[in-house]
Amino acid sequence: MTEPAIKAMIQLMDDSDQEVVHMVETQIRTLGPSIIPILESEWENLSLNPVLQNKIENLIHEFQMESMKTRLMHWKQSGAMDLLEGMWILATYRFPEYSFATLKKDMDQLYYEVWPQMRDNLHPIDQIKVLNGVMFDQLKFGANTKNFHAANNSFINVVLESKKGNPISLCVIYMWVAQKLGMPVYGVNLPNLFVLTHKQNGLQFYINVFNKGLIFNKIDIDNYIAQLNLTPNEIYYNPCSNLEIIRRVIRNLMMAYEKAGEQDYKDELNELIDLLD
């Protein structure tokens, strides 16, 4: 369909006949996300028609959601190997123009900040201390305790810019840098608190990134689980998958939107959970 024809259909979305509006919107939906640039262009030209602007916004969001679902499903079916890609896909939920290339560039820059200070002969705990020094003392990453439940804490682009996040977003950034440096650092799905573990050759310890990289051990997890009156489970001690991490990020977002009274966003995110189950 030609661009003029699409623009004519967009104008018909403002028709007084609701049957015409329904038919036109249905037809536009069949065209798919490729027409988003045309929709955006028309939106800019309709400042005096907020009702039609709102309809266009809803269509754009539907198309963006469709694209996001497709990317997320492809990511899962491809083995969910690249955690950074999964985090980028989630970020495009609210920041559709955000590119993976931009995310990769920003993450690489973090790596280059740490790499010159790392030494091959360092003990694993000392390696973590070096990483902590750069991430928390030099670069000033830290916990967003003032707005702990804010949705932006789960969007990696916002966390990289503000340097404030929740446990899982900070852990993802920290873990990616650590793994790029060759460290066997992985995520651990503790209840109410996402942490990391360094696990290799019989040596295992844990890292609380939300508390400036505090190092702790299995006994501390035992005590934590006991305080929560939970039965010990292997998942509280061992690495989890990238898929589990992305699921948890989505659930955090759902909770954030529920607390903010944004039920529509929560319902949409629940569709993503269904895709990944």
Spans of model-derived segments:
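A structural boundary/capping signal
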Residues: M1-D277
